[in-house]
Amino acid sequence: MGKLAPVATIKTVPGKREEYLKHLKAHSKRYLATEPGALKFEIMVPHDQADTVMLYEVYASPEAFDAHWNGLAKKEANHDLEPLRASASAVRCNLVE
């Protein structure tokens, strides 16, 4: 199987998006620097949705994503991000190259 590209939509606690983004940016840099299978981590903010953040991530394989999801860096990120997150959903996609 090829690269895995999850696309996530996150609703932050009302009024907390900027704080969420501050933490998310710092953690995303660490993911890319320390997780060999993490290839891309893009953060997007939709127009006219003040408390929404979207993510586009690319991992070398489903196993690389699982290593990220269950890894220490993700657990540390959740410590900062979970109190600011109201909900999250994601779609796992195969990257077509």
Where are each of the predicted segments found?
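Short histidine/acidic/glycine/proline-rich micro-motifs that form metal-
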Residues: 11-14, 97
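Generic helix-packing signal
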Residues: 10-12, 31-32, 72, 92
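Short, well-ordered beta-strand segments in beta-rich or mixed alpha/beta enzyme
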Residues: 4-11, 40-69
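Glycine-rich beta-strand-turn "strand-cap" elements at beta-sheet edges
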Residues: 2-4, 42-51, 76-97
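Localized chelating/binding microdomains
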Residues: 25, 55, 87
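Generic serine detector
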Residues: 28, 61, 87-89
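Short amphipathic alpha-helical segments
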Residues: 16-40, 73-80
